[in-house]
A protein has these predicted regions:
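Secondary-structure capping and domain/repeat boundary segments
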Residues: 1-206
Length: 206
């Protein structure tokens, strides 16, 4: 940015998934920059961020593993029930989530507390393991499985949930172990439009 001596600069606050904006600083220093004050010299400025913390609540009935945050700002939490218990779901900041199974991947938008919900296993009942889009869910024999939210994949259209090549009906009682997978259809490419947009942008910049 070019600014006249003594003027201020309006700068939009940048964002980074999984992080809080911590301010603008002179590059290589701990000197904060306040753009509401008049600018009187050249500056080389960088934005800095603080990573949100994800804390697991300890339980006597199982354990939780919290991954490192990836480049997309995602954190993966994995629950493992102790013998005699089954995993039933997640609570995030004390509230139940729509996430059905484990592991659970999400982008924190603030410092977050994650708790795994466990249930004591009834030895008189039969349970089945259902893997749905990589998440493991334990379902009692004869019960149905809640349909999860439709997954999103960039450049693709979600067309349904499938088991062994056939679309799965979530009203079907679970009577055995299952692997349910999301199926997608590739959307038409728009390279031509993208190229035109880039050329238009370059023209404006010149």
């Amino acid at each position: 940015h070019k600014v006249k001596d003594g003027e201020t600069l309006t700068v939009e606050e940048p964002s980074k998934p999984g992080h809080a904006f911590a301010g603008f600083y002179l590059v290589g220093t701990d000197t904060a920059v306040d753009f509401t004050k008049p600018i009187t010299s050249d500056m080389n400025v960088e934005s800095r961020f603080t990573q949100y913390k994800v804390t697991a609540v300890e339980s006597e009935n199982g354990t939780i593993t919290v991954s490192e945050m990836n480049d997309k700002g995602e954190v993966t939490v994995t629950a493992k029930a102790n013998d005699g218990y089954i995993f039933k779901g997640w609570k995030v900041d004390g509230k139940e989530t729509e996430a059905l199974g484990t592991p659970y991947t999400f982008v924190p938008v603030k410092d977050t507390t994650v708790e795994a919900v466990y249930e004591k296993k009834d030895d008189t009942k039969v349970y089945h393991t259902v893997i749905i889009n990589g998440q493991t869910v334990t379902v009692e024999d004869g019960k149905t499985l809640d349909r999860p939210a439709d997954p999103v994949k960039e450049g693709y259209k979600f067309i349904g949930w499938f088991v062994d090549g056939k679309e799965f009906d979530f009203n079907t009682p679970i009577t055995g172990d299952l692997k349910i997978e999301a199926r997608f259809e590739k959307l038409p490419t728009t390279d031509k439009n993208d190229k035109n947009d880039k050329n238009h942008l370059q023209t404006l910049l010149h």
